[in-house]
């Protein structure tokens, strides 16, 4: 479900402008390992249809943060306390009350790939289900920072989704590198509201089915899995994550406060 990079975008001048503008204005796990069961209790498995999954993070008892390109509907199921994609006694299955895609989400540029989902019922917090708190500030993540991302997506480009939760350690890559001709080449532009992360040698990445998974850097929630290249784990196209900037955090808090 993690998006692959799209066709040629706007002009280079426009792309450079997008990269430099300030905050204002409106995948599968490759190269990772299966986690200890229920050791990531904040993870939410999103079953959007019989054969489509995404992931998300439980940020309040009845709120999940995921990606805007995950097509959440009234019939979508949010499974908390999951290690396996199959039924487990620890799982809590909740349904959607209302979805709030980020209003400035752009399918073409991939800017603002965030979505808040309010659940019909509150989750029961226990050893298998826990809240992942939002960061206090939207501090940018420096290149070289170690991060981790988990999900139930593919662990190989031709594989089916993983039956169990997997996680991979990745490193933040400078946006200038991700935008150069050896990588995304500004198609699309990796802007200030995105985090580029993976391994410059390739082989470590999120993948299809990991969309919406939380990116944790130094143990802090910093991003949401958004898109990547045609092939997961390809060194030319590291994974790209929506950065939880102050602008995004303010929107999240406003939506949750206004929907009480």
Curated annotation (Swiss-Prot):
Q: Tissue range of expression?
A: Found in cytotoxic lymphocytes and in normal lymphoid tissues such as thymus and spleen.
- Pro-sequence residue ranges: 27-28
Compartments where located = Secreted; Cytoplasmic granule
Q: Which Gene3D superfamilies match?
A: Trypsin-like serine proteases
EC number(s) recorded for this UniProt protein: 3.4.21.78
Q: Which residues form the signal peptide?
A: 1-26
- Protein name, UniProt field: Granzyme A
User: Could you tell me which species this protein originates from?
Assistant: Mus musculus (Mouse)
